[in-house]
A protein has these predicted regions:
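N-terminal pre-domain/capping segments
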Residues: 1-99
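Acidic/histidine-rich catalytic cores of soluble enzymes
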Residues: 10, 39-40, 131-214
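Generic beta-structure capping elements
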Residues: 13, 103-105, 202-204
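Acidic-and-aromatic substrate-binding clefts and catalytic sites of carbohydrate-active enzymes
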Residues: 16-23, 42-56, 76-85, 107-112, ...
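Alpha-helical scaffolding segments of alpha/beta enzyme cores, especially the outer helices
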Residues: 27-31, 55-66, 86-94, 115, ...
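Short, basic, helix/turn surface patches
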Residues: 68-76, 97-107, 125-133, 168-173
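Active-site groove signature of glycoside hydrolases
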Residues: 95-115, 134-146
Length: 214
């Protein structure tokens, strides 16, 4: 008997190679359900890619429901949320998502500079409010570069983000990338208590490499 995993979602980005056709998409959902997943995270890939995807979002949600899955959250680009807020809200509501996460700061921001995060913290407030009015919440998914010590006082960019972002802005800590940034994930999770609706967990392989020095 397959053990059900009701609170763990599969990120569709991780199975993007199996989303190329509607048939493959439905097969991938079957496999995820058989493994024990009961939720997925939307990714703009395969038949779901683009503003007018081959598989409409209505049909995608119907497919999720047929396979016994819900769409818990989505990754979307900031430019789409900023420039087409109402359309993005409709997209998220159609999928049945409660949360939307950004993968990184895109142009005109510089993802390696603290001032860009400061400017974003101001620019993002109207979108945060619009999403909140629609019953949705927004957050940030980290990689490793946010743990560079490029903050104004020598702190990490991530710590700077936590301090300067609107308190309604949430986080989706990726423990793999936190570790890759030479930070203890447990410390980050404790620091973000109350602002974490989702966590990304993935495998990491330790590959022994012979270096050229200390």
């Amino acid at each position: 008997m397959v053990k059900e995993i009701p609170q763990i979602a599969a990120q569709l980005y991780c199975v993007q190679d199996y989303l190329g056709t509607v048939k493959e998409f439905e097969f991938a959902l079957d496999q995820l359900h058989q493994i024990g997943y009961r939720a997925v995270q939307y990714a703009n890939r395969g038949v779901l890619a683009g503003d007018n995807p081959e598989l409409s979002l209505v049909r995608a949600r119907e497919a999720f429901e047929r396979k016994g899955l819900v769409c818990s959250s989505a990754h979307r680009p900031w430019s789409a949320l900023r420039d087409n807020t109402d359309i993005e809200i409709e997209r998220l509501q159609t999928l049945g998502c409660s949360y939307v996460f950004l993968n990184f700061l895109e142009q005109p921001y510089d993802m390696h500079e603290a001032d860009s995060y400061r400017r974003f913290s101001i620019d993002s407030v109207p979108v945060i409010q619009a999403l909140e009015d629609a019953g949705l919440q927004i957050g940030f998914h980290n990689h490793s570069h946010e743990f560079q010590r490029n903050g104004p006082d020598g702190e990490t960019l991530f710590e700077f983000m936590v301090e300067c972002f609107d308190e309604r802005f949430l986080f989706e800590p990726d423990v793999y990338w936190i570790s890759n940034g030479a930070i203890d994930p447990a410390e980050v999770l404790a620091r973000l208590k109350g602002r974490i609706p989702c966590v990304h967990v993935k495998d990491a392989e330790v590959i022994p490499v012979e270096g050229d020095g200390a």
